[in-house]
Amino acid sequence: MRTDRGDPDRPDDALTPAVRDRRSRVAFAPDPLPADVERRLFDAARWAPSGGNGQPWRFVVTRRGTPGHDALAASLRPGNAWATAAPLLVATVVRTVHVHPEKPPKRNRHALLDLGLATGNLLAQATADGVVAHAMGGFDRDVAFDAIGVRAPWDVGVLVALGWPGDPDALPEEVRAKETGPRVRLPLDALVFEDRLDPAEAAPDDDAEAGGA
């Protein structure tokens, strides 16, 4: 596949809007999501593909102002403290082994991919509905496990903050850049190769993580 470097700060205008316009915002309004909107987000996740249609994902929803939300929010790393303002804090959970009534348990090598596909569907649907959906890996796993009662063979993938967009001006200055800063991605020719991977060309740029997500 031949590509040009393009503009790593700008997606192709022809991309579907749910992909093109998605970003990891951090400002939330306090208003709860209507039940039909909330249901639609998880229905989008439900229809994601998975290996053998195993659907190893689950979602644990906690609502701001409840003990469950407080317990899960306590797992957040300090850099993600802004997520406590989200009306919903969701733990994405995945079953990491195949369970079959007539066979011994076997590790599911594709479980995290399946969970990622389902979570990606949720994020895309949220973007289409004007909902902020921000997935985070910055949390204490032990605290999160205890908060939602997860035990092996289940694992927590990411936490997702969900809610309506809020006022960026109300954010602390050090957090506001996450909301308003540029989105930066590697150019296509650093990601897509014909026939063989070139390790030198595949190395990430030094500034690949700069800007918003």
Across the structure, where does each feature detected by a protein language model lie?
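Acidic, surface-exposed loops and disordered segments
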Residues: 1-213
